[in-house]
C-alpha cells in the first residue's frame, strides 16, 4: 500500500459537519485495510485569496496508508461534496507520524498562554 498526505478545506458554514466527514473518510480507509497515521483538524483559517467569495475555511490534514482504489474513492467524494472547497492528495514515500508545523505552532502557542496565565496567577 502507498502513503498519502491529504488536505481538504471545508466551507466555514459547514464546520459542524467536519467530525462526521473525518469519521466517514477514516472509516473508508480502515475498512479497505488501510491505516491513518496522522489526523489533524486545523480548524478555521484565513485563506490566502478568496474562494467562492469566502475568506476562511476549515482545514483538515490526514496522512494515510491505503490502496489506490480508496484514494480514488476519497477523491470522488471530495469532488461531489459541495462542502469541500478544495483538496490536495499527495503521494509520499513513507508514513509521516510526527506532528505537522501547524500543530506544533498551535501547541507552542497554547503552552505560552498557559504559562502566561500561571505567572499572572502566581503574582497575584
From Swiss-Prot:
One of its GO terms (molecular function) is small ribosomal subunit rRNA binding. Signal peptide: none annotated. GO terms for cellular component: cytosolic small ribosomal subunit. The keyword RNA-binding applies. Gene3D superfamilies: 3.30.70.60. Transmembrane segments: none annotated. PROSITE patterns: RIBOSOMAL_S6. It comes from the Bacteria. Keywords: Ribonucleoprotein, Ribosomal protein, RNA-binding, rRNA-binding. One of its GO terms (biological process) is translation. InterPro entries: Ribosomal_bS6, Ribosomal_bS6_CS, Ribosomal_bS6_sf, Ribosomal_S6_plastid/chlpt, Transl_elong_EF1B/ribsomal_bS6. The keyword Endoplasmic reticulum does not apply. Pfam families: Ribosomal_S6. Binds together with bS18 to 16S ribosomal RNA. Belongs to the bacterial ribosomal protein bS6 family. This is Small ribosomal subunit protein bS6. The gene is rpsF.
Amino acid at each position: 500500500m502507498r502513503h498519502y498526505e491529504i488536505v481538504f478545506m471545508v466551507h466555514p458554514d459547514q464546520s459542524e459537519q467536519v467530525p462526521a466527514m473525518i469519521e466517514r473518510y477514516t472509516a473508508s480507509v480502515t475498512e479497505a485495510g488501510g491505516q491513518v497515521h496522522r489526523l489533524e483538524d486545523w480548524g478555521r483559517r484565513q485563506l490566502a485569496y478568496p474562494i467562492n467569495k469566502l475568506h476562511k475555511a476549515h482545514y483538515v490534514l490526514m496522512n494515510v496508508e491505503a490502496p489506490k482504489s480508496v484514494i480514488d474513492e476519497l477523491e470522488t467524494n471530495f469532488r461531489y461534496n459541495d462542502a469541500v472547497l478544495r483538496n490536495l492528495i499527495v503521494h509520499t514515500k513513507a508514513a509521516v507520524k510526527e506532528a505537522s508545523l501547524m500543530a506544533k505552532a498551535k501547541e507552542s502557542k497554547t503552552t505560552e498562554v498557559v504559562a502566561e496565565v500561571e505567572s499572572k496567577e502566581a503574582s497575584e
